[in-house]
Amino acid sequence: MGNASSIVQTINVTGDGNVFKPSAETSSTAVPSLSLSPGMLNPGGVPWIAIGDETSVTSPGALRRMTSKDIPETAIINTDNSSGAVPSESALVPYNDEPLVVVTEHAIANFTKAEMALEFNREFLDKLRVLSVSPKYSDLLTYVDCYVGVSARQALNNFQKQVPVITPTRQTMYVDSIQAALKALEKWEIDLRVAQTLLPTNVPIGEVSCPMQSVVKLLDDQLPDDSLIRRYPKEAAVALAKRNGGIQWMDVSEGTVMNEAVNAVAASALAPSASAPPLEEKSKLTEQAMDLVTAAEPEIIASLVPVPAPVFAIPPKPADYNVRTLKIDEATWLRMIPKTMNTPFQIQVTDNTGTSWHMNLRGGTRVVNLDQIAPMRFVLDLGGKSYKETSWDPNGKKVGFIVFQSKIPFELWTAASQIGQATVVNYVQLYAEDSSFTAQSIIATTSLAYNYEPEQLNKTDPEMNYYLLAAFIDSAAISTSNMTQPDVWDALLTMSPLSAGEVTVKGAVVSEVIPADLVGSYTPESLNASLPNDAARCMIDRASKIAEAIKIDDDAGPDEYSPNSVPIQGQLAISQLETGYGVRIFNPKGILSKIASRAMQAFIGDPSTIITQAAPVLSDKNNWIALAQGVKTSLRTKSLSAGVKTAVSKLSSSESIQSWTQGFLDKVSTHFPAPKPDCPQSGDSGDGSARRLKRDSYAGVVKRGYTR
């Protein structure tokens, strides 16, 4: 395999003295978390310059934007650019007259961090002759004295010295050079990660070890033949050592082993202490919990005053229904011909091509009342259903969506003459095969879709009703005795809102919502039948974020109090003292604590409990408001501590992983043994380095034919 020369040492990858001793304090890290979002990088403003020395900058038109042509005359006086305004690498950059932009300190710090990330792979980049000169963002910056602002009016009161500026061309070329290097590193980075995960190279706590020669042999035996590590083993060794302080190579010339890792700061934050989880983990989890609570907007979801529907609404999410199983009195957006109407009747409708279709209506037929629906996409899937009868096989039959309009309510229809107009808006042909059960024919997955938009129906008559039906249709008349199904709603109907900002409450479109009034106002049946954009679903979605935040932060068990459950306890303590009706029950604090804890645990398991009337505690809006506000306070007042149970559990779990890892590495050393130092091979002259080369017949990746 040979020697590799790096800046600090000469190494022998397959030789003696190398160390493989991963520990929690030297865990691998190479991920540069860059903050390059536009909101962080911009706006830094632009530089402005006075038009003339005699002109007051407060005069109209006294400032103009600086361009690259202004740099020489302004930068000569700046000590940072004493050699001239043009940076040392500017010969490589076109020097055109371009407007300048101000670079924020945040941008400089993050681009510098990106440069550092590339240097993890410097030896490999040099081998490829890619980015032979380490990029330096500061070389492309010029520091000038100027007025700074997005507008001239803002800039005239903001004169600054030594402001970093850059032209768009230089900025683009710099980013392109970084991107080109990252492109060249794509497979290299993957292969390095494969090598680091083929066997455990990190441990969550403590320390593990294995002879490095055994590790190298395992990698040689298992790495893919096209792995770049086989082609560039020396460069890979250096790159791995920079990432992981547990991988150390002996300096052959000095006879010393040094930790080459550059991640000591990050690794220490990732390591647990003897009694607490890693600092980074605690910080991240607290941040996640706070982000969830912020997204839930506790003030909005606990409001006792009306909130505009667009403010309360969430991004629309699809909801699934089986229309045949919904109660008509709960799903107020449905209509049904009474089952007592015993005489089926045939109707004939057309589609947008003028083709005529026949269908039947009968008692029990259901439709969607489009007048109570916001713009919506309907997708009906009959997959897995049978619909077979003695004289009716669904295979090859067609099902369609039909839109009706009539001034007569649907539930009063008894004849085709009562229908104003109707059209087939879409249809599909079914494929079905005989089931394993007798007399059943299973329909394959279907996708009968329709996008409902009110504007398409030209709703000008306020007395006109609009309905959507899913049913079998045929080009010939369908015998009412052969096909007895009232419709084909016994399927999976997915409804997806096409517009955001519209909210319904139990089927009625509303302009505003009082969130606190939603608490405990739905039965499980009415919640199940609610539309996708129902206020209850919006409330549950927001409440789910609160529940997830509690789960991240809280490790209290059943009946145990916690900072997140005691807000409910406080509310219960006061409410039992309030004057009311019936027998008053006074619970001691121990009982109240358990009641509050159970209510919180039920909420974590199913956030919809705040909406349904079945939840005895959180269906009270006062208890819900206390919880929502209390969780926010609990997280805001938390430091970087962790729950007692969480700390103990994670530490004991980490110790079990440490034991497993060491056991695995012991097996590696057993099955891929390192040469014994006291067994020189014939011809050994006694020189350490010569003995190392001769006795290692396996020689790591050298056996694959690579040059030492």
Swiss-Prot record:
InterPro entries on file: Mu1/VP4 (IPR009113), Mu1/VP4_sf (IPR036256), Mu1_membr_pen_domI (IPR015961), Mu1_membr_pen_domII (IPR015962), Mu1_membr_pen_domIII (IPR044937), Mu1_membr_pen_domIV (IPR015960)
Modifications made to the protein after synthesis: Cleaved during the endosomal proteolytic disassembly of the outer capsid. Mu-1 is proteolytically cleaved into mu-1N and mu-1C during the maturation step to generate the ISVP. Cleavage of mu-1 to mu-1C is dependent on myristoylation and binding to sigma-3 protein. Mu-1C is further cleaved into delta (59 kDa), and phi (13 kDa) segments during entry into the host cell cytoplasm.
Gene Ontology cellular component terms for the protein in this record: host cell endoplasmic reticulum; host cell mitochondrion; host cell plasma membrane; membrane; viral outer capsid
Pfam families for the chain: Reovirus_M2
N-myristoyl glycine lipid modification positions: 2
Membrane in keyword set: yes
Residues annotated as glycosylated: 3, 12, 81, 110, 458, 482, 528
SUPFAM superfamilies from the UniProt entry: Membrane penetration protein mu1
GO-annotated biological processes: symbiont entry into host cell via permeabilization of host membrane
Membrane-spanning residues: none
Keywords of the record: Apoptosis, Capsid protein, Glycoprotein, Host cell membrane, Host endoplasmic reticulum, Host membrane, Host mitochondrion, Lipoprotein, Membrane, Myristate, Outer capsid protein, Viral penetration into host cytoplasm, Viral penetration via permeabilization of host membrane, Virion, Virus entry into host cell
Domain of life of the organism encoding this protein: Viruses
Keyword Membrane: yes
Site (described: Cleavage): 42-43
Region (Disordered): 671-708
GO MF term (any one): host cell surface binding
Disulfide bonds: none
Function: Major outer capsid protein involved in host cell membrane penetration. In the endocytic compartment, outer-capsid protein sigma-3 is removed by cathepsin proteases, which exposes the viral membrane-penetration protein mu-1. Both myristoylated peptides mu-1N and phi are released during infectious subvirion particles (ISVP) formation in the endosome. They associate with host membranes and mu-1N induces permeabilization and delivery of transcriptionally active viral particles into the host cell cytoplasm. Seems to induce apoptosis in the host cell. The viral outer shell polypeptides, of which mu-1 is one, impose structural constraints that prevent elongation of nascent transcripts by the RNA-dependent RNA polymerase lambda-3.
Domain notes: The C-terminal region, phi, determines both targeting to intracellular membranes and induction of apoptosis.
Protein family per UniProt: Belongs to the orthoreovirus mu-1 protein family.
Assembly with partners or alone: Heterohexamer of three sigma-3 and three Mu-1 proteins.
Official protein name in the record: Outer capsid protein mu-1
Highest classification ranks of the organism: Viruses, Riboviria, Orthornavirae, Duplornaviricota, Resentoviricetes
